[in-house]
Amino acid sequence: MTKKIEDLILYKDEHYFSSFPSIVLLENNTLLLLFRRARDSRWLLDAEDEESLLIKQQVDHVDSRSQITKIFFNTDLQAISEPEALTINPEAADQDASLLMLSNKTLLLSSFSWYPVHSRVAGALQKKGVSLYGHPDVTGCFYISWGGFTRQSHDMGKTWSAHDYLPVLPNTRDIIPEKRGRHGGATRGQAIEVGNEVLLPVYAPLKNDKVSCSHLLVSNDAGVSWQYRSIIARDQEQKLSLNEPSLLQLEDDKIMAFLRNTSGNDHLITTISNDRGKTWEDWQERKVIGHPTHPLKLKDGRIFICYGYRHEPFGIRGHLIDSSGTNFIGEEIIIRDDGFCGDVGYPWSVQLANGNVLVVYYFTENDGIRHIAGTVLDIE
């Protein structure tokens, strides 16, 4: 049985749209929280009329100045540092943060970025076949998906290396024809370390595909350089985009991937590899509804997954799975069901020193302020 101990607000500021968190337990049992922070001009709206309420519900996931922000917490889950933005990318806007502590005590951050494009050059770029996202009337400008990158910290998150873009994915369309390839696609999900390899999941469409698929990159030097290994999952029928993959090591070289089913019925997709991702079994649609999924192996060997639930009632949910990744255990865990709108989710979990599990996520309550929240669970 799972018992909720408490809900927490970890960071909330009406001037910012805070979202897409990741968290890691450091050596001294303190916690490092990273999340995307962007400007949010909705704080200027004082009215509670119908139009203002609709604006507060609107999704706004791109901003030309979005940044990855860090906060350190103690074992009592109290902030012990002020929010501080990591050094920014001077040419593009940083998005989701995904963290991994390596065995050599290096912190690996993977993320991706959007390149802002002025409206006066948008038409010419589109004629060249460049795919643009957004519109100045809605998102302030146009954007180009600029690729995935990694950064490293060798001092427990105090300082970080520069943005290092991932290699170009094979058999994918250039972001800018003959000028910029698709560097790693996008990343949102858990990387893992297996033996002497770091396995990093990413996602991007193949050159002739209509939908996106998930790919695996591998590093043999603790995340300094990367090579392409395989396609994790792809819909041969070209109906489902299989995105935002997260990895979990089951045992030895056996790993499991958890994927978002973007253009289908929002059911969780999973697949297993028995050789560190060189080959993958056929992917399966599971009974869980929600996205994206973060998997956590508990100290007793069971797997705890958490995911956003963007259907009424909006919130955060979870489930237990046996150690093989095959069978779901018990009933679905309702972590939160009081969201103001569907703009919630992207949870990440960590087991604390006392055995409890902390789930962090972004959330929206009736005031419309997107913030980073957390829930502490006692999982028996």
For the regions a protein language model found, what residue spans apply to each?
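Asp-box/BNR beta-propeller blade signature and adjacent active/binding-site loops
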Residues: M1-E380
